[in-house]
A protein has these predicted regions:
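Domain-terminus/edge residues, biased toward the C-terminal soluble/receptor-binding domains
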Residues: 8-210
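Short, small-residue-biased leader/transition segments that mark boundaries at the very start
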Residues: 3-4
Length: 210
């Protein structure tokens, strides 16, 4: 039957939630990332052409699975994951055209090209980085009735690691302390939890410091 429904919509975010939940199922991972499947004497290749070396324009050695789909209205779509050097990314490309690119004589399914470009950018441009190190001082708070000091340092309980752009200038990162008390009553013990902090980059909270 006709799969097109006028009010049938979804988003890349919706697809990511469904896919991430499905990837928790070992059988789903096994079958959705199988490059080809033998069935009754036939070899059935995965419809994601990024998995097949023979398709030079599309092939991406780090790609795995997951799902492709196309209709006249939705054009070309792909959900694919890639793993490299300990990093794992999920690319979801929707409503991508089929067209000639770079003076080619044939039509290119741009969903695969776009997903490949996204992965190449992510692996080259993003890095897992320690933004705040364990025991790093991020502020201070006054202490009432203290014997040796009027203030104590607020330090991070653990390392806080986040994926950020390569070469990030840490001055662009804002550490915003949350619910800081006006003062503490002595005695204050080492390791005592006082408050937390948000790490903000580009007007977005990217992590929290306990």
């Amino acid at each position: 039957g006709d799969v097109y429904k006028r009010q049938h919509y979804t988003t890349a975010r919706d697809m990511s939630k469904i896919t991430l939940a499905a990837l928790k199922n070992a059988n789903f991972v096994k079958y959705s990332t199988t490059t080809e499947y033998e069935y009754k004497g036939y070899t059935l290749p995965h419809t994601n052409l990024m998995l097949h070396p023979g398709y030079v324009t599309y092939y991406y050695e780090y790609a795995q699975g997951i799902k492709t789909g196309s209709t006249e209205q939705a054009e070309y779509n792909v959900i694919v994951k890639a793993s490299k050097d300990g990093y794992n990314y999920l690319a979801i490309v929707m409503k991508s055209p089929q067209q000639k690119i770079k003076n080619q004589s044939y039509l290119t399914k741009c969903s695969f090209v776009d997903a490949k470009s996204l992965f190449e950018w992510a692996f080259d441009s993003l890095k897992y980085t320690t933004i705040v190190a364990k025991d790093e001082v991020i502020g201070e708070v006054s202490v009432e009735n203290g014997k040796d000091a009027d203030t104590v340092a607020l330090v991070a309980a653990n390392d806080t690691n986040v994926i950020v752009p390569v070469g990030l200038d840490k001055s662009a990162v804002i550490i915003e302390i949350q619910e800081k008390p006006s003062s503490l009553q002595a005695p204050v013990t080492k390791g005592q939890k006082v408050c937390s902090a948000n790490i903000i980059y580009g007007d977005e909270v990217i992590a929290s410091v306990p």
